[in-house]
Regions:
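Short, compact, well-ordered microdomains
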Residues: 44-78
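Polar low-complexity intrinsically disordered regions enriched in Ser/Thr and small residues
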Residues: 5, 25, 32, 41, ...
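A generic alpha-helix propensity feature with a strong bias for hydrophobic helices
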Residues: 13-16, 31, 36, 63-64, ...
Length: 78
């Protein structure tokens, strides 16, 4: 199961938060129902970016300042 980048789409774009979600095993490319930090993914957008390989970041560099710290910890500890 891969990690998908899912983006909370708030009313204010400067409050963007990037979360990690596992990939749904039944529908590849769709996120699981909740993020790694436990937030519902139903209203989130899936970013098409994928890590280049083992050891690379799970999120695109342009989102580095917007990563959910709880998702980051969950991905690193997995």
């Amino acid at each position: 199961m891969g990690i998908l980048v899912v983006i909370e789409q708030p009313e204010q774009p400067d409050l963007l938060v990037v979360h990690a979600s596992g990939s749904d095993p039944d529908v590849p490319g769709d996120p699981l129902p909740v993020t790694a930090c436990g937030i519902d993914t139903a209203s989130m957008a899936v970013d098409p970016w994928r890590p280049s390989g083992p050891g690379s970041r799970w999120y695109p560099p342009q989102y580095a300042g917007h990563v959910c710290p709880r998702c980051e910890r969950a991905v690193r500890s997995a």
